[in-house]
């Protein structure tokens, strides 16, 4: 409250009311003086000297707020001081009001909370406080957090006695500038050698940008575009390892430290400090602090104290007991009865014994190893034989022709006796363990559905899968992929009305529910095995082209392509685009087979721009485009029958073959396919091979003819050699 306003109020009661109103708003109560106790002399307005603000400034000091009793008695103290303090005040040194210091509490700025320093841990290194102040004030990182990882046992990979600091940068540029400035400050001030992982130096950034531009030019010349989810320039995360600083090492008792020490070498004195600098998005994405906190909690539960050495216990032998010569017959029989029975978990169980052979009982070797339960052991042996015979049955079924294999599978799910294969299969199934029997039954149903057996339905397969997971049986990744292939199995029928060119929605729903259940059981579904299967399932299974819905019935099949509605075609494209975004965001590694499947889908849908983009991404992924890729490419264009596309592909891809690392040269198989494309693009190639044709096509045509003739000559020589060897007399 302004002093001018207080001095302007001449009445003592008015001043008290004004002061009481402001003080009551701050939560402090003042007891007003009794009216009857005020004498006429005291009721007279006091002399307004310069000491008036000095007496009343105590009401707004920190003491009045901290102790309400002092503020409550302020009026009585002032009234008592008025009687005898005037001579004393005159004797004191006069201090004008404009020279007196005021205690003002400044309101905290909202951004102040982001710049608060974290509390120091126990026994911190001397440099830690200065380090935190520099990170917060000079380079401007927000939301600082400090984790004390010195108690971790075993220590983390960054090193023992670790203290980790987290900070948020305001942008990627601020992140790089802050890390560079921080490292330079550590080098110049403390002569440290920090290691900043993820920081690009000024010259290194220029080099990377120059290389990226050069790579983009090379890719553009190859007929593709540069598309990479991560260019390696902006990561949003820089880890600065300050190094080992003096002090801050937690002390441990000598005896306990020697007992728990394993290894060799000297213990390094000091504390390692690591500063994690991240942008706000990257910090929320990886949530590194939560991971380290979980590690600390687990470490505190696992190691409440230093471990104490324990005496070595004898090994526990499952299924057999080993006794020494000092064990009596009664004790021996008791030990046998108390031995746990054999568990049929279908794994090979081993045990070792540390007792010496000379201490064994020499009176008889029959008591050295005694089976605990003969019935369980016999059942386990039968189960093992069943496990060996079931794969042989599936191997026999896979070697049959599709029609004969369908006959061996009988009438359907309920048929168990119509064929010898089913009889033997279910006999072996009854001998094996429940979890293996359930998995083998699922395998049989998948095989039947993939063979397009009409008696086995996908709904029954999914129901059997639900029973398998409800029983809490193991769900290996190979079994999930096998069931997924069966649910996504589909054969297009262009002659039906309307044409069946895509997987039905009900089958797709079952497949998605399968993937969801597998993810809940811990299977990694962000993998090429799952994503590419779904990508192919939502796509068309034959060559199509889009027309308007009104022209769908009148549109004809052109160029081996079937007309489809443009609305459905765009819906398929949207789903494919979302799946492609997931693949790029999750950085899913694709292989040769996956890229060939994607190329075929884009070719079937007539999306040539996406086709050549995917062709260029193969080289960017580090996959060699060898003979298999070019066989697929030229075969695809030969099947399409489009002479314009074939001509463009020949002119662009034949030089590309010779620029591959290693180059792809013509052999008889590849030359045959390229010859078909040349004959399609240039029908009169034989007559006009020397006239008005590009030199590249003429040269390629001669190479193909030469490769095919050489192959025929080699085959003729082999037949002659075989004929001569067949006529030679046997030794």
From Swiss-Prot:
Q: Does the keyword Hydrolase apply?
A: no
Say yes or no: keyword Transit peptide present: yes
Annotated region Disordered: the residues are 68-93
Report the protein's function: Probable mitochondrial mRNA stabilization factor.
**Where is the chain membrane-spanning?**
none
Family matches, as Gene3D superfamilies: Beta Polymerase, domain 2 (3.30.460.10)
Organelle targeting peptide span: 1-29
Quick one: a GO biological-process term for this protein? mRNA stabilization
Q: Member of which family? A: Belongs to the ATP25 family.
Where it sits in the cell: the answer is: Mitochondrion inner membrane
Would you tell me the Gene Ontology cellular component terms? mitochondrial inner membrane
What is the membrane topology here?
A: Peripheral membrane protein
This chain belongs to the protein called ATPase synthesis protein 25, mitochondrial
The UniProt keywords, alphabetically, are: Membrane, Mitochondrion, Mitochondrion inner membrane, Transit peptide
Q: Where is the composition biased (Polar residues)?
A: 76-90
């Amino acid at each position: 409250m302004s002093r001018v306003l207080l001095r302007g109020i001449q009445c003592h009661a008015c001043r008290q009311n004004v002061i009481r109103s402001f003080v009551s708003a701050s939560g402090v109560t003042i007891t007003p003086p009794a009216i009857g106790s005020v004498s006429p002399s005291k009721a007279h307005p006091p002399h307004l000297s310069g000491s008036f603000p000095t007496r009343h400034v105590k009401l707004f000091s920190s003491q009045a707020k901290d102790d309400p009793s002092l503020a409550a008695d302020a009026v009585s103290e002032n009234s008592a001081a008025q009687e005898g303090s005037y001579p004393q005040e005159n004797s004191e040194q006069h201090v004008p009001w404009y020279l007196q210091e005021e205690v003002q509490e400044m309101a905290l700025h909202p951004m102040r909370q982001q710049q608060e320093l974290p509390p120091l841990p126990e026994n911190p290194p001397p440099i830690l406080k200065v380090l935190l102040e520099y990170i917060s004030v000079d380079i401007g990182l927000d939301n600082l957090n400090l984790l004390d990882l010195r108690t971790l046992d075993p220590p983390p990979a960054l090193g023992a006695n670790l203290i980790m600091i987290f900070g948020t940068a305001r942008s990627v540029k601020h992140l790089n500038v802050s890390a560079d400035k921080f490292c330079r400050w550590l080098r110049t001030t403390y002569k440290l050698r920090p290691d900043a992982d993820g920081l690009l130096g000024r010259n290194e950034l220029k080099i990377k940008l120059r290389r990226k531009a050069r790579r983009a030019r090379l890719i553009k010349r190859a007929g593709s575009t540069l598309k990479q989810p991560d260019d390696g320039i902006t990561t949003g995360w820089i880890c600065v390892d300050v190094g080992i600083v003096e002090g801050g090492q937690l002390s441990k008792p000598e005896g306990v430290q020697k007992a728990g020490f394993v290894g060799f070498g000297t213990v390094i004195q000091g504390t390692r400090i690591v500063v994690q600098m991240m942008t706000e998005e990257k910090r929320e994405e990886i949530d590194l602090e939560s991971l380290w906190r979980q590690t600390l909690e687990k470490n505190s539960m696992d190691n409440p104290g230093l471990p104490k050495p324990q005496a070595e216990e004898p090994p526990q032998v499952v299924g057999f007991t080993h006794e020494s010569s000092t064990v009596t017959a009664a004790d021996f029989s008791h030990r046998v009865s108390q031995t746990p029975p054999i568990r049929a978990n279908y794994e090979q169980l081993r045990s070792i014994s540390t007792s010496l052979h000379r201490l064994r009982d020499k009176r008889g070797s029959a008591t050295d190893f005694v089976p605990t339960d003969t019935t369980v052991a016999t059942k386990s042996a039968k189960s093992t034989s069943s496990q060996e015979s079931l794969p042989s049955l599936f191997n026999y079924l896979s070697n049959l022709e599709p029609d004969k294999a369908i006959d061996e599978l009988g009438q359907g799910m309920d048929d168990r006796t119509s064929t010898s294969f089913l009889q033997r299969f279910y006999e072996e199934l009854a001998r094996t363990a429940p979890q293996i029997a359930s998995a083998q039954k699922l395998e049989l149903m998948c095989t039947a559905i993939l063979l397009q057996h009409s008696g086995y339905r996908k709904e029954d397969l999914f129901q059997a899968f639900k029973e398998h997971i409800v029983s809490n049986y193991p769900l290996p990744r190979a079994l999930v992929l096998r069931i997924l292939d069966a649910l996504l199995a589909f054969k297009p029928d262009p002659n039906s009305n309307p044409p069946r060119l895509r997987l039905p929605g009900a089958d797709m729903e079952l497949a998605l529910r399968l993937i969801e259940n597998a993810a809940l059981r811990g299977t990694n579904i962000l993998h090429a095995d799952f994503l590419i299967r779904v990508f192919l399932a939502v796509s068309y299974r034959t060559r199509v082209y889009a027309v308007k819905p009104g022209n769908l019935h009148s549109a004809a099949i052109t160029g081996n392509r079937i007309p489809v509605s443009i609305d459905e075609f765009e819906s398929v494209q949207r789903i494919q685009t979302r799946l492609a975004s997931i693949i790029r965001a999750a950085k899913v590694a694709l292989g040769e087979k996956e890229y060939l499947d994607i190329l075929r889908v884009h070719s079937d849908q007539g999306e040539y721009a996406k086709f050549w983009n995917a062709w260029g991404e193969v080289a960017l992924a580090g996959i060699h485009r060898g003979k298999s890729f070019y066989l697929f490419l030229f075969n695809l264009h030969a099947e399409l029958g489009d002479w314009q596309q074939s001509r463009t592909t020949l002119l662009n891809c034949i030089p590309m073959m010779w620029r591959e690392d290693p180059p792809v040269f013509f052999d008889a198989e590849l030359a045959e396919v390229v010859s078909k494309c040349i004959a399609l693009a240039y029908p009169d190639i034989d007559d006009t091979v020397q006239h008005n044709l590009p030199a590249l096509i003429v040269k390629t045509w001669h190479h193909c003819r030469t490769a095919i003739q050489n192959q025929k000559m080699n085959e003729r020589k082999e037949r002659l050699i075989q004929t001569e060897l067949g006529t030679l007399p046997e030794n």
